[in-house]
């Protein structure tokens, strides 16, 4: 029963189809913040 529902849940509904690429990018935002923290600390000399 659960295995039959997984492909259905894996696809976005038609109304949200345009946001597909955005959904692919959103999980990467925390990684960018982590990298930004390292760049910031490197610029201030790791005080």
Swiss-Prot record:
GO annotations of cellular component type: photosystem II reaction center; plasma membrane-derived thylakoid membrane
Pfam families named among the record's database cross-references: PsbK
Membrane-spanning segments: 19-39
Major location category of this protein: membrane
Keywords assigned: Membrane, Photosynthesis, Photosystem II, Reaction center, Thylakoid, Transmembrane, Transmembrane helix
Cysteine disulfide partners in this protein: none
Compartments where located: Cellular thylakoid membrane
Propeptide: 1-10
GO biological process entries: photosynthesis
Topology relative to the membrane: Single-pass membrane protein
InterPro entries assigned to the protein according to its UniProt record, in alphabetical order: PSII_PsbK, PSII_PsbK_sf
Protein family membership: Belongs to the PsbK family.
Function noted in UniProt: One of the components of the core complex of photosystem II (PSII). PSII is a light-driven water:plastoquinone oxidoreductase that uses light energy to abstract electrons from H(2)O, generating O(2) and a proton gradient subsequently used for ATP formation. It consists of a core antenna complex that captures photons, and an electron transfer chain that converts photonic excitation into a charge separation.
Subunit structure, interactors included: PSII is composed of 1 copy each of membrane proteins PsbA, PsbB, PsbC, PsbD, PsbE, PsbF, PsbH, PsbI, PsbJ, PsbK, PsbL, PsbM, PsbT, PsbX, PsbY, PsbZ, Psb30/Ycf12, peripheral proteins PsbO, CyanoQ (PsbQ), PsbU, PsbV and a large number of cofactors. It forms dimeric complexes.
Protein name per Swiss-Prot or TrEMBL: Photosystem II reaction center protein K
Gene (name only): psbK
């Amino acid at each position: 029963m659960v295995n039959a529902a997984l492909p259905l849940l894996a696809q976005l509904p038609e109304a949200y189809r345009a946001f597909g690429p955005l959904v692919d990018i959103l999980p990467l935002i925390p990684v960018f913040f982590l990298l930004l923290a390292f760049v910031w600390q490197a610029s201030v000399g790791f005080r």
